[in-house]
Regions:
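...captures the hydrophobic TM-helix bundle architecture rather than a specific catalytic motif
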Residues: 1-439, 443-489
């Protein structure tokens, strides 16, 4: 790789990083940029990154190189204590890979982020949180770029975290209202599950192959070629962790409940986050780990099943929504499920093309969402009457006795939130509440204080709907919080 391609590859990441630094440092120093200056900085940063990526593509086409690798070395190295051991220790390698998977997703991210940035400049004009939005937007762009071109799972994790952090704060953008903050917290919890699975996958990769490099895991060939360098059982275990990470980020069933709640954010963030880019990160991760699916048929079947369940859930739920942003979010979910199923079937280019086309379409639809009623009136005026309304296809072909059941199931969004609360959240809270009391009992005994015996696990009170139950059990509650209201359904 010559100096030309190295410089272009570096600029692709450096431009959004400098944008985040410029906006973030100015905010910390309380010397915020003006709206026109912020808009110009954003446009220039996205333009530099996009032109650098296009120049890199031109260089690759001219030289016939299947990919370009920029290795920035190990930023962290932890050597084993025993010098005679065969274990190589831990190292955090920063490696960027530009290949047939990362470049299309990178170009898609930059084009759509640039479009949304220009739209948000006008949409949020004179909004009190204008500067805060663009700081989070810059963080999101940098996260998407890093995730797109990551050559190691550690680099991908950094970008993954930046996307998740900025997404949560954008959901809770309107902080003066309680609903966006509650829904942002819900998104944060699901993202934490996804992040934990990805972190466990990173640790497992180091235990299996001694590094977090995707080339070592996937055989070193340029995407989509390559073969997994681990056994079938190891591929299944590692792949299941990556599937959980993808499920959390892409809202696959059963972790789909956060997606409509994420619509509390501004329309620009809804378009670029949950309609176009971040909702596809799970599918992108599965595409990157494609050789693992080839090595483990059981893993491929699991991916197909989760994808089809998500597609069906999104299809039925989207058809009963009463607001446009929720309807679009569930429609996006249905397409993401189909993309995931295509990946599980062993296809690589078809889901990539599907992903790009779907992201562009949803971005346009989300941007036009605020003017939907006006567009509808213009269309009716043009045809001189009301538009004909026809029941959905599934309503026409479903027997009458099943319609009410399916309709109610779709209205209740599959009862996924309730099932997760009963089967996962309450048992975990009950267990850790009991462990907390047991720990307090042990520390009080060591300190010479007396405390009642810890209750049996079955008698630990479950968390109440308003969240006061487990806080009181942990010793932090001070009675009900009158300002807290249940989650909106």
């Amino acid at each position: 790789m010559n100096h030309y391609t190295e410089s272009l590859a570096f600029l692709v990441v450096a431009a959004p990083a400098l944008l985040l630094a410029a906006l973030g440092v100015a905010s910390l120093l309380d010397r915020r940029w003006s709206e026109p200056a912020t808009s110009r900085l954003t446009r220039w940063a996205i333009a530099v990154a996009l032109l650098s990526a296009l120049g890199l593509v031109a260089g690759m086409l001219a030289t016939g190189a299947p990919r370009v690798i920029l290795d920035l070395g190990n930023w962290v190295e932890i050597h084993p204590h025993d010098a005679g051991t065969d274990h190589p220790g831990y190292h955090f390698q920063v490696k960027l890979v530009f290949d047939q998977l990362s470049i299309p997703f990178l170009l898609l991210s930059l084009v759509l982020c640039g479009t949304i940035g220009a739209f948000a400049t006008r949409y949020l004009h004179r909004e009190p949180g204008f500067n805060r939005f663009f700081v989070l937007y810059a963080s999101f762009v940098l996260g998407m770029v890093l995730t797109s071109v990551a050559g190691t799972i550690e680099t991908l994790f950094v970008g993954w975290e930046l996307v998740g952090m900025s997404s949560v704060f954008l959901v809770a953008f309107f902080q003066e209202r309680p609903a966006p903050v509650r829904n942002g917290l819900r998104v944060w919890v699901v993202y934490r599950v996804s992040d934990a699975a990805l972190l466990l996958a990173a640790v497992l990769m180091h235990r299996m192959i001694g590094a977090g490099d995707f080339d070592k895991l996937l055989g070193g060939g340029a995407w989509p070629d390559g073969a997994a360098s681990v056994s079938e059982s190891q591929a299944l275990l590692l792949g299941l962790l990556l599937l959980v990470a993808a499920a959390g980020k892409s809202a696959l069933v059963p972790l789909s409940g956060w997606l409509p709640r994420a619509m509390e954010g501004p329309t620009p963030s809804s378009a670029v986050l949950y309609g176009a880019l971040s909702v596809h990160l799970g599918a992108f991760l599965l595409l990157r780990a494609g050789p693992l699916l080839d090595a483990s048929p059981a893993l491929a079947v699991a991916v197909v099943v989760f994808g089809l369940l998500t597609a069906l859930f999104g299809f039925f739920t989207a058809s009963v929504q009463t607001d446009i942003k929720s309807a679009l979010s569930f429609a996006s979910l249905a397409q993401v499920g189909i993309i995931v199923a295509e990946i599980g079937l062993g296809w690589r280019y078809i889901p990539l093309v599907h992903l790009i086309g779907h992201a562009c379409l949803r971005t346009l639809q989300f941007i036009r969402a605020p003017t939907l009623l006006q567009d509808y009136r213009h269309l009716e005026n043009a045809i001189g009457g009301r538009l004909p309304r026809r029941p959905a296809l599934w309503v026409r072909i479903t027997p009458a006795r099943w319609r009410v059941f399916l309709y109610r199931l779709a209205i209740e969004r599959g009862h996924l939130d309730a099932l997760l609360a009963v089967l996962v959240v309450q048992p975990f809270v009950k267990l850790f509440t009991w462990l907390d009391r047991l720990d307090r009992r042990a520390t009080d005994t060591l300190a010479g204080q007396n405390r009642d015996e810890p209750p049996a696990l079955d008698h630990v009170p479950p968390p109440s709907e308003n969240g006061t139950g487990h806080h009181a059990a942990l010793g932090h509650g001070h009675g009900p919080n009158p300002s807290h209201t249940p989650n909106d359904e």
